[in-house]
């Protein structure tokens, strides 16, 4: 039975390859304000890697539209139905979050001028995306092992090779380097070997998952509200602004409970989002904090993720629902998506964490909640 639980929670090479090979079909339109020729150019069709980022597609998109672009310095950004897209959120997460009913191809608009700096943080192309990725990896390492030294001590060559593997979707190259960071896989028996923890207390070596202390899984939650009486997700109103999306960083600590063979995704979500899983809240029907913020500045290769910075990161986990800007009254969970999959709530959570995480070691979960219409008060 124990071996069976290990299999249920363990890492799957096939699942990892499917995640790394996943892509969103994109149809990119050039905004009318950037068109300088007639007739206007046709849209550009491409595949956006789920684990990739929109700015990394700019070189091939610009090549397609180059003959019609206005002169001047490019300030490239993307929008979907009027919403500027956060460049540091993976393409797959943006798609799962903003397309309630999957749209194929996903129609995006690209702008080469008029960057909305009041909404989006600056992006200087690949370098900005790389620093954002490395910073997230350091944060994840701190959550998992208690410090970020394993990432900080990477050589420049290894950092470059790791980033190239992410950009090119090279899972084998990624695994060759990432396994040295000791950031996974998470194991069901990670709570039992306490003696090894005592032996490491005086050491600066990072603890790998399974070293005896509770596993801590880096999780990013994106909570979107839709109409509760929505019959078909294709009728969901589009997201008008990022303030309507609740973004929550809540590391999940795996604690074994007596009588529980493994922790399900439902159990994890009840812990991560108790405001939506109260005794009166509903499960996902069978039939069917604020906007995310980029780092204030791009960290350099020598920057560390300190306990103080991670205290800020983990503050969401201990904050009240009000502080997270999530109003739980009159809301029920309607849909949960991870890597484009509407996940069964009974699936082992550690299997999801091990196999559906992104290359920066965060598990991104999109949650749709139905909002009930408020009943008018008597006489009003």
From Swiss-Prot:
Cross-link (Glycyl lysine isopeptide (Lys-Gly) (interchain with G-Cter in ATG12)): 138
GO molecular function, one term: Atg8-family ligase activity
Region of interest called Disordered, as start-end residue ranges on this chain: 194-215, 283-309
Main location class: cytoplasm
GO cellular component: Atg12-Atg5-Atg16 complex; autophagosome; mitochondria-associated endoplasmic reticulum membrane contact site; phagophore; phagophore assembly site membrane
Membrane-spanning residues: none
Subcellular location per the Swiss-Prot or TrEMBL entry: Cytoplasm
Alphabetized UniProt keyword annotations: Autophagy, Cytoplasm, Isopeptide bond, Protein transport, Transport, Ubl conjugation
Signal peptide residues on this chain, from the entry's feature table: none
PTM note: Conjugated to ATG12; which is essential for autophagy.
Keyword Lyase belongs to the record: no
Biased composition (Polar residues): 194-203
Superkingdom, natural source: Eukaryota
One example of a Gene Ontology biological process annotation: piecemeal microautophagy of the nucleus
Coiled coil: none
UniProt KW Ubl conjugation keyword: yes
Protein family membership: Belongs to the ATG5 family.
Subunit structure and binding partners: Conjugated to ATG12.
Function (record text): Required for autophagy. Conjugation to ATG12 is essential for plant nutrient recycling.
Protein name: Autophagy protein 5
Originating species: Oryza sativa subsp. indica
């Amino acid at each position: 039975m124990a071996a069976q639980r290990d299999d249920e929670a363990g890492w799957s090479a096939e699942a990892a390859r499917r995640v790394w090979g996943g892509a969103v079909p994109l149809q990119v339109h050039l905004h009318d304000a950037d068109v300088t020729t007639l007739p206007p150019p046709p849209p550009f069709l491409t595949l956006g890697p789920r684990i990739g980022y929109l700015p990394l597609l700019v070189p091939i998109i610009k090549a397609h539209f180059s003959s019609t672009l206005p002169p001047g310095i490019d300030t490239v950004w993307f929008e979907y139905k009027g919403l500027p897209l956060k460049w540091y959120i993976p393409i797959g997460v943006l798609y799962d979050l903003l397309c309630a009913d999957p749209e194929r191809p996903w129609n995006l608009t690209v702008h080469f001028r008029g960057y909305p700096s009041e909404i989006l943080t600056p992006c200087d192309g690949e370098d900005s995306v790389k620093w954002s990725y490395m910073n997230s990896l350091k944060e994840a390492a701190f959550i998992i092992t208690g410090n970020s030294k394993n990432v900080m001590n990477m050589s420049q060559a290894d950092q470059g090779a790791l980033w190239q593997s992410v950009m090119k979707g090279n899972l084998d190259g990624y695994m060759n380097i990432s396994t040295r960071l000791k950031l996974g896989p998470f194991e069901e028996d990670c709570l039992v070997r306490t003696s090894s923890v005592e032996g490491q207390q005086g050491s600066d070596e990072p603890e790998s998952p399974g070293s005896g202390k509770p596993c801590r899984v880096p999780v990013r939650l994106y909570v979107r509200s839709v109409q509760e009486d929505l019959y078909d997700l294709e009728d969901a109103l589009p997201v008008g602004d990022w303030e309507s999306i609740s973004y929550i960083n809540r590391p999940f600590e795996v604690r074994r409970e007596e009588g529980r063979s493994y922790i399900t995704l439902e159990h994890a979500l009840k812990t991560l989002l108790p405001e939506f899983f109260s005794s009166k809240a509903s499960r996902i029907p069978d039939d069917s904090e604020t906007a995310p913020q980029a780092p204030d500045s791009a960290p350099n290769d020598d920057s560390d993720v300190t306990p103080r910075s991670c205290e800020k990161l983990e503050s969401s986990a201990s904050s009240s629902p009000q502080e997270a800007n999530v109003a739980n009254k009159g809301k029920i969970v309607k849909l949960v998506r991870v890597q484009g999959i509407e996940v069964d709530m009974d699936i082992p959570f550690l299997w999801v964490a091990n196999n559906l995480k992104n290359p920066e070691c965060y598990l991104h979960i999109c949650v749709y909640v139905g909002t009930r219409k408020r009943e008018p008060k008597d006489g009003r």
